[in-house]
Amino acid sequence: MAGTTRDAIDTRFENEYGKYNFIDTAGIRRQSKVDDKIEKYSVLRAHMAVERADVCLLVIDATEGVTDQDEKIAGIAHEAGKAVIIVVNKWDLPETEDKDTVKYSKKVYEALSYMTYAPIIYVSALTGQRVVKIFEQINYVFNQSKMRVSTGMLNDVLNEAITRVQPPSDKGRRLKVYYMTQASVAPPTFVLFCNSAALFHFSYQRYIENCLRDTFGFKGTPIKLIIRQRSEEDETKL
C-alpha cells in the first residue's frame, strides 16, 4: 500500500524559528468504515507518525468542533506522552458558530478533559491568520517537554503540597510520600516513593501533577508519575 494517499508524508521546512520536519498523517474515518483495510492502515500509520514526532499538532475544524476522530488522535498522542498543540482551523469562516475563543476553548477542553495542558491556537490556513504562532508554540512546548527539575526543587514543591493537602488514608493507615525525583523527559517523568502505592489514589496523583504544573509550567506536555512503594524500614536505612 506504500504510496497511497493514506501514507504519512514528511515535509522538511525551515524558517526564522528553526528547522522542522512535518509528518502529515491521513485522517481516521468514522467507526462504521474503520474495518476497511486502507483505513486500518491509516490508523496504524497515525500511530507510527505520532511515535516519531516530538510535538503533535491536533488540527480541529472550527465549524465541526471536536469530532470522534479528533478524540481518537488526541488519545494516541496523549498515551504516547507527546507534547501537543491544539490548532483550531477555519476560524475566519462566517459559519463558525461561536467566535468567542474562551467559550470555544472551554468546549474543546470539556471534550478532551485529559488534555487541558495543551495550548489552543486559533488560525486560518487559508488566510495565514496567526499561523506564525504555531511555530512559536512548537518551540515552546518542545522545550517544556524536555525540562528537567532538580530533586531539591521537586521536593520543596512536594513538601509544600503535602502540607497544604494531607495525603489520603484508609483503615487507619495514611499515605506517606517520602520524596520525588525526575527520571526522564519527553514526557517529564517523575518517580514518587511512598509507603503504600494502593493509598496513592489517582485524585492525589492529579493534585501532585497540578502542583508541578503550577510551579514549573510543563505547558503542552503530559506528565507521567511513577509510584514506587517502599517500607518505612527501607526509608530509615537511607
Regions inferred by a protein language model and the residue ranges of each:
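C-terminal-of-GTPase-core extension/linker across diverse P-loop GTPases
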Residues: 1-23, 31-44, 48, 52-58, ...
